[in-house]
Amino acid sequence: MLTDTAIRRLESIGQVAKSGKRINGLFRLMESEIVWLEAYARIYANKGAITQGVNQNTLDGFSYERVRTLINQLRDGTYHPKPTRRVFIPKANGKLRPLGLPTGDDKLVQEVVRILLEKIYEPLFSKYSHGFRPRRSTHTALDQIDSTWNGTKWIVNVDIQGFFDNMNHKLLLDLLSKKIEDKRFLNLIGSLLQAGYLEEWKFHGTYSGTPQGGICSPILSNIYLNELDIFLENLAKEFNTGARRRANPLYKHYTHRIRVIRKQVDAGMRDQKTVQEEISALEKVRRPLPSGDPLDPSFKRLHFCRYADDFVIGVIGSKREAEAIMGAVKTFISTTLKLNIAEEKSHIVHASKGTSFLGYTIKTYTGRKIIKTRRGSRHIRMKSVSKQLQLHIPAGRLEKFCTSKKYGNYQKLKARHRTQFLNQSEVEIISAYNAELRGLANYYALATGAKARISKLYRLWQVSLFKTLAAKRKTTVNKVATSLRLDDGGYGIHYQVKGQMRTLRLFRLKTWEQPRVDSSELDVEPNLALFIMTKSELIQRLNANKCEYCETETGPFEVHHVRGLKSIRPGKELWQRIMIARNRKTLILCKRCHQLLTAGKLPPPEALRCR
C-alpha cells in the first residue's frame, strides 16, 4: 500500500469506527512500511529494546530489509509468534509479578497491531477510563474524582481477581469482531494471545489472559473492560435522579427572614443601618447550615473511575442502594465478562472513612466551603451542601519511601549517607536525589496539603544528600552545605560541559510548582496526521541511507542499540565516542559495520572506506 494511501486510511479509521461500521483492510495496512517505521520509532527507546526473549532476536539490527521480511511472512502465513520468556519482577508489596518478554520481531508486530487497535478504539473508549491511553494517566483519573465526586457518601470497591491472567480469549475475540471485520487481523491477534511462554525453558500454553509485558496487552485489556465502562454508564443513567438537591428547610427559613427584612429596606419601611446588625446575626446562624438537604432521597448520583483493572464507584444515595449497585457490578463481571471477584478485597466504605486508589487515599470531609452567588440585585453567600472530597497522601507512605531510599530514620528525623553513591560523580549523585524526590512530589501533587506533608521527608532527604557528598569529599556536612549555597538561597553545583559552565540545582520544595492536570485539554482533538505518522529523527537518519561510522552509502543499513549511554565509557572505541558525542543510544550502520561491531572486530573507519 502506498504511503499516502496508508496515512489517509489510518486517519479515517477512527471516524469509521465511530459511525458504527466494522473496519476491514487492517491486514493490508500492515503491508505498508510506513506503519512499521512508526511502530519502531515508538518503541526503540524503551529499556527493553535489546532485552532478549526466548532467543537472541531483539530490536538491535532494525532495517528496511527486516521489515520487508516480516511483511512477507505475514502475507504468506509463515509468521508465527514465539513464546515469551517469563521472568518475575518485584511488586511494591514484596511479592513477584510475572512478566513476559517477547522477541524483537514479535515486539514490532505487536506494536503495529497496537497502533491499529488504538486508531479504532480510542475514539470509542469511555471518558472514565484512564489507563494506558494517550494523554491520560493516574493524575487525570484522580483529578476527575477530585473535581466531580463532591457529595459522595459511599465508595464501592470491587476487585477483579487476576484480571490479566484470566481474560477469556473467545470473549475478547468476539468483542473485537464487533468492530473489526478483517479475519486475518483477528487471527493474528489470536495467535499472539496463544503463543504461550517459557519458564525455566519449559513451555506453557496460554489459554486465557494476556501476557503482562506484552505491548498489545494494555489496549486489549481496555477493549475487554470497555464493556464494564458501558455497563456502569448505563447503570448511572438509570440510577441518577434529580437535577439538584431540595432546599434545607432550616436554611430556607433563615434565608426567607433575611429576604423579608431586605424587602422592607427596599420599600423604605426600615432603615438599612438599623437592620444590618439583625441581618448579620441571622446570617451567622445560617452560615453553618448546608443550603441543600444532604438526606434528600430524590437526589442520587453514581460516579465511577477506572484505571486498567482498578476501578472505584462513588454513590450519592443510601447504603442499601450502594449494596445493590455492588451486587449488579459483581454479577456483570462474573457472568458477562467471565471473571472472578476477589471477595476479601471488595467492600463498601463510607466516604468519610476513605479508601485507597492509585496510591492516594480518597475521602470526604464536612467542609465550610462558601459559594458566592447572585440573587436579584444582591450577592449572597451559601454554604455548600456537599461534603468536600479530598485526595491525601496515605499514612505511612512517606516513611516507607524514606526507608526504601535509605535516607535515614523518618520518625527520629535522623539522616544518613548512602554508600551506594560514593563512587558516582557529584552531578550524578545530585541528579539521582533530585529525580527521587521530585518524582514523589509530582506524583502526590494533587494531594491536599502536599507541600506541608512532604516537608519532613524533604528535610531528611536534603541532609542525607549533604551527608553523602560529605562522605565522598571526606569533609563535614556544614562545609558541603556552604559550598553548594547559591545566591538566591537555594543549593546547587557548578560544573563544566565542553567548556561551558552549568549549574545543577537541588530540588527545592519551597519553589516547587505543583503541576495540576488541566482536564479541559483532554477533549482537544489531536492532529492525527502528526500524531500517527510523526517522522522521528531516528527514521530520518535511517532514510538518509548512509552509515554513520564508515560513511558508505551502500546498504542495507541497520540500527545498532546500546542499553544506555552510561554503559559507554569515553576513551574506548571510536564508535562509542561517536554515540557519546551525539548523545544517542542508536547508531545507523551498514550491514558490514554492524556485523563487525557485534563480533568486536570493528576497525577504524579509514580502513573500511578503502574497501
Named regions from a protein language model:
Residues 1-611:
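Non-catalytic terminal/accessory segments
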